[in-house]
Amino acid sequence: MPDHKEEKIRVYRNPAKNEEYFKNRVGMGTSYDVGVRKLTILDKEIQLYYLNGLCDTAYIIHLMRELVAINNRKEDPDELVDIVENRLLNAQVEKVKTLDETTDQVLSGLVAVIVEGAGFAFIIDVRSYPGRNPEEPDTEKVVRGARDGFVENIVVNTALLRRRIRDERLRVKMTKVGERSKTDLSICYIEDIADPDLVEIVEKEIASIDVDGLTMADKTVEEFIVNQSYNPFPLVRYTERPDVAANHVLEGHVIIIVDTSPSVIITPTTLFHHVQHAEEYRQAPSVGTFLRWVRFFGILASTLFLPIWFLFVLQPDLLPDNMKFIGLNKDTHIPIILQIFLADLGIEFLRMAAIHTPTALSTAMGLIAAVLIGQIAIEVGLFSPEVILYVSLAAIGTFTTPSYELSLANKMSRLVLMILVALFHIKGLVIGFTVLIIAMASIKSLQTPYLWPLIPFNGKALWQVLVRTAKPGAKVRPSIVHPKNRLRQPTNS
């Protein structure tokens, strides 16, 4: 968030002025959740400012008991500030001299304790955000592996990452983004691995974000730090799995954690980062390689399968005699291109309906879509059976794509290729696919080539992409992130 140069107001020594400031600044007395508790200790007023719902109420009650107990002892009123400081039994207590920062901290869920005449506020971290416990992400499930996942609490997410990387060189830099929302955001990397230039680029991009609030959390941050424009391909990778995030941090990537989001942003990324899945690394290298190739085939099928089949329908002479069955077995009244688009649109309707349908009704909805709509549409001649079959196969290929954002981009590419094939036949397919590759090769994500290690070519890195190698054999980190320390394992191992 860019610096807005305004004169900071220091904490008043007069309690009445501090209370007036909070009434004017945050609407205390108007907003029901902004609270203040005033205590008289040793003939001086102590104010506790807090936000209902974001603080641990039990601790606030405990704190008030500790402060009131001071009256039961013979203490020097001139030493009240030191006495109060010693009574603040909490792991995180800091002194803040301005009311602006005090207000921001209170709105973040911390408690401010202001002693009359002190001229500063004690800020106590007793945040207790409402939220859920870590659980396995729905979109990144594995047969073997951890069952925890990121949640909407940045403190919990940082702890999940710290639990996996207990390295004293792991850095978690906290900042606030959003002029009004002041959303907490942290940048995570390992100091002696991550490229300092990459860290500087990410920090500068985040510091330059000038927006009212991060209502869409990490997605808003993404649109500011990378020049997405109308490019459908994802330029950063999202993950809800702490083990995946930790693995990328150890490779030299920079992770961005945004409060209120159950996903973290991995930067920088290439196309091949979006086609990897944690399941491949939970199986034997040979099995992991097999799963990876099956996934690659599904991703390619989701993009190219339908355009190629449609080309064979338009030009049956391209097929050898023993493969003529791939085409249409009978003519239909509706153009094939329209059938394909309608079937694809129907699958999108089904996907959107599944998202908004309660779990208890989703099975019934699937049966209605698959049996009633699909079967009846074929029987009445609206669709040919081949169209339903091949559109379904392409849809299954879409679902095998680990990255949801990449699957949508591939679907858009497929529709464009379909139109080009309908207009120009084989020339349209060749030209469209060539333009697609050139466009992807020209993309850069935080100065990282999108098609690396294919373009520019790096044989060793490409082998790591195509084959799931055993961990003892993966001794160096990917060169694309320019790590300060390329060795994954100690030199004496």
From Swiss-Prot:
It is a multi-pass membrane protein. This is Stage V sporulation protein AF. One of its GO terms (biological process) is sporulation resulting in formation of a cellular spore. Coiled coil: none annotated. The keyword Transmembrane applies. It comes from the Bacteria. It is found in: Cell membrane. Keywords: Cell membrane, Membrane, Sporulation, Transmembrane, Transmembrane helix. Belongs to the GerABKA family. GO terms for cellular component: plasma membrane. PANTHER family: SPORE GERMINATION PROTEIN, STAGE V SPORULATION PROTEIN AF. The keyword DNA-binding does not apply. The chain crosses the membrane at residues 296-316, 334-354, 363-383, 387-407, 418-438.
